[in-house]
Amino acid sequence: FNLEAEGFDRGVHDLFGLEHLEGLAPPFTDRIEIEFIAEDASRWNSFLAGELDFIKVPVSQFDQVLQSREPPALNPDFGDRYHLLANLESGFVHTDFNMDDQRIGYHPDAGQNERNKALRCAIIKAFDWQKRNEVFYYGIGQVFPGIIPPAAPEFDPQQDASSVQRDLQGARSLLEQNGWNADNLPVLEYGFPSSVTERQMFEQFRSFLGDIGYPPGKIRPLTFATYGDYARAYLNREVMMVTTGWTMDYPDAENTVQLFYGPNVSPGSNNANYRNGEFDRLYRSSSSMQASEMRTAIYRNMNRIVIDDCVTISGVSRRLI
């Protein structure tokens, strides 16, 4: 291992204790053990007890750990004992509507199909991304419109952000104009694996929709014992609203737009089971193109198509501490 060849900069990397790797051959450790501890409190307590060497800090502990949010900096008590890494994730969190569910998605009757779209758009307008970011991501996540996250080089900072800005009056108007009312609104089933945090996210979502007159009793949790059970259900198209996170396999918008490509419907990566002829045509035409301004323009157009079809409540890239 040659530190100089790897770009070692003492001014930047001196805190990480890399000098002892000089001249060694990888792997640098005999064993790496990864513990999967689902509950935040248990995972955090194990870390403080010295049972874990590395952890993604639960948001509930940010006030205790951080001296400042921007830029993230450790409180002195933690800074003396631990090293901090703070990065915007190369992905995003989003909630997809299952377009194969006729209560909210595609419907064979053209009129009902349009009413369902209006309902999805109203739900998106009712969603409060500022509160979601503040409560669950400490206000340091980056909210953005659509499905091309900030980590992708094709991300458009000038994209119209109205799809991630709360508009209660606009949501109520959409419902009224399309004949939706408290009596005929469908039951919404919000899926998630059983955990305290996921339940809190559901309750927050239900409160958002309550602000536009959606009856609380018609917004119901669809809980699963494990994430595996949850994944099996949404891959079988059994979940009406699917919340997932996606981490890019490589830094290119192709890796996120494929999440909405028609042939990738469940059990593929298209959890929304979204099908749009123009979107699919653009995906096929761009898949063989090299990175270029033209390809970037195509991806940004595809992003707008998904936004306009109100297929997903998206999104936020979390800042991981």
Located regions from the model:
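Structural transition elements
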Residues: F1, Q142-N178, F192-Q200
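Gly/Pro-rich hinge or "lid" segments in bacterial periplasmic/extracellular proteins
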Residues: F1-E33, A38-S42, L168-Q169, S173
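Immediate post-signal peptide segment of exported/extracytoplasmic ligand-binding proteins
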Residues: A25-D30, K117, L168, R172-E189
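Short, well-ordered beta-strand elements
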Residues: T29-E35, L185-S194, I219-L222
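Second-shell loop/turn segments in exported
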Residues: R31-F36, E51, Q102-N113, L119-A122, ...
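Extracellular/periplasmic solute-recognition and catalytic clefts
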Residues: E35-D101, Q130, E134-F136, V143
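Short helices/loops that flank or line small-molecule/ion binding pockets
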Residues: A41-L52, Q67-R69, E203-I212, G228-V239
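Extracytoplasmic/peripheral linker and loop segments enriched in polar/acidic and small residues
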Residues: G79-R81, L88, K117-C121, K125, ...
